[in-house]
Amino acid sequence: EMCIRDRYDTTDYENIDPQYGTLETFQELLTACHDRGIRVILDLAMNHSSSSHPWFQQAAEYLKSLPEGEEPDSSECPYVDYYHFSREYQGGYAQLDGTAWYYEARFWDGMPDLNLENEAVRREFEQIADFWLDMGVDGFRLDAVKEYVTGSTEDNVEILSWFADYVHGKDPENYLVCECWTDQNTYAKYYESGVDSMFDFAFADKSGIIANVMNGKAAATSYAKNLETEQGMYAQYNPDYINAPFYTNHDMGRSAGYYAGENSEAQTKMGNALNLLMNGNVFLYYGEELGMKGSGKDENKRAPMYWSKDGNAEGMCKGPADMDDFRMKFDSLEEQQEDPDSIYNYVKQVIRVRNQNPVIARGTTAYLEQYSGEQCFALTRSYEGSNLLLLGNTSAEAVSVDLTGLTVGGTTAEELVLLGELYTGEETAERAGTVVTLPAYSILILGEE
C-alpha cells in the first residue's frame, strides 16, 4: 500500500493498494497465473518507505518529543534506528518538520531511506518476504539497490547477499532481479551477492546499445560484440548468473519515440527483436509490443495500456493525473491484432521463435567478427550441444554476407537449416551457396538439423 502517484512510497508492505484491489483479488490473480504456468514477482522497495509509514511516524514523534540536547535512545523507540537521522544537514537529507533533525531521503522527502544495516530492519523484511512468498509469489524485483548505502557498492552487495541467502534459503527457485541504474562495470559487481539477475541497462534506453545500433549511431557489430563480452564480466562474479535484458521501463521514454522518418516502424519492430533475442530472462515493458508512445515526464511513460481506441472499452483507464494528453503513433491492440503486419504480430512472432528455440535464452553467445560489419551482425548461440546462427541487418538497405569458411557446431554454412526469419517489410532473405542476402531491418536464425 502506498500514497503517491508512482507507488514507491510504501505505507504497508503487507497489503495491496486499494486502487488495484484486495489481497483476495491478488490471490485470485496468482492462482490464475500459476494455472497457466506464469510466475509472478513483486516489486519490493526496501531502500525507503513512505514518510507516512508507521515506522517513520513513530520515529518522528519520538524525535519531536525529545528534550533539546538529549541523544535518541533506541530502547525507548526502536524505530529511530530504522532510518538515518542526523543533527547535521548532509546532501540527500531532508529536514524533519518542526525539529532540528534531518533524515536521509535520496529520492524525495516523502520517501525516507531505511537503514538496511540494522538487524531489526532486516528481520522486518524477512517477515515481509515470508508474507508474500508463503502466499505463492515467485520472487521479487528489487528497486534502487545502488541507493541502499549510497556510494558503496561493497555495502550494497553485502545487503543483497543477506536478502538473497534468505529468499533462496526458503526455495532456490525464488527469483530475484535487481534494478541498479548505473554503468555496466558497476552493476556487474552486484552479481557477487548471489541474486539471480541484474537488469542489463547497457542495452536499454534511447542511448543504449540497441537504440544506437537501430539508429545507425553504432555499428551492428556492437550488438553482437557486447553480448559476447558481457558474459565474462558477469560470470566472474557469479557463474550461475541469469542476464535480465530489457529495452525500456517505467522510467524511460518508450522506444517508438527513438525513431523518426519513413523507417521508424521497421526500426521500432527490430529494436524489440534485438531485446527479445538476447539470452537470459528478457523483460518487455507493457505496450512496447504496440509501439506505444510516452516520453518526458514520468506520467507519460506510464500511460494506460492501449487496449482500444474507444476510451470506454473494457480495460481502458484514464492514466496518472498529471499525464499529458497525447495521441498514440500506432494503433491499439484491438486493431493491431487484426493486422498481420503490425508491431504486435511481429513481436508475437519473435517470442514464438525464442520459445521454439530454447538455446536462444539459455545459450552462450560468440560474436563472429569476420561476418559482421557496420550494417550486419553475426553471432552463434550454443547450449549443451545445440548451436544456432543469428544474422541481422540493422540498416535500411539489403546486405549480402558471405559465410565461406563458417561452421556452426559441425555444420557448414550451406547446410544450416532455417529456424526463424523476422522481416519488417515485403522482401525475404535469399541464400545462394554460402552467400546470404538479408533485406532491410531483418533477422535470420539458422541452425543444425
Where are these regions (language model features)?
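C-terminal beta-strand-rich structural cap/linker in extracellular carbohydrate-active enzymes
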Residues: 428-449
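Acidic/aromatic-lined carbohydrate-recognition and catalytic surfaces
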Residues: 1-123, 134, 145-193
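Loop/helix patches that line or flank the sugar-binding groove of alpha-linked glycan CAZymes
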Residues: 170, 175, 246-249, 258-400, ...
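Short, acidic/polar
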Residues: 119-133, 268, 272
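Hydrophobic faces of well-ordered beta-strands that scaffold small-molecule active sites
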Residues: 40-42, 140, 176-178, 245, ...
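Short glycine/proline-rich turn/loop motifs
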Residues: 102-117, 249-256, 324-334
